[in-house]
Amino acid sequence: MAASKTTIFIVFVLCLSCTLLVNISGIQATSSTLKESLTAEIKPTKVDRCKTDRDCPQSHRCQKDFYYGCVVGECICRAV
């Protein structure tokens, strides 16, 4: 009984150490990978306050198949 517990413990420790070794020595980003990445700028948007959907502006500013709706007091574009 003690031998089987010891064997299970040793196998567990080996699996855990292999997992940690793979995670620590994982793939690192190189300079060539970084050059291919995309960057995006985030711009703050003006928030339209509302009480109902009718308080929101026309939906032509939203993407196709979206409309302005009032959610928690703010006008947001929602999917149809």
Swiss-Prot record:
Residues 1-29 form the signal peptide. Disulfide bonds join 50-70, 56-75, 62-77. Transmembrane segments: none annotated. Its main location: secreted. One of its GO terms (biological process) is defense response to fungus. Keywords: Antimicrobial, Disulfide bond, Fungicide, Plant defense, Secreted, Signal. It is found in: Secreted. One of its GO terms (cellular component) is extracellular region. Belongs to the DEFL family. This is Defensin-like protein 291.
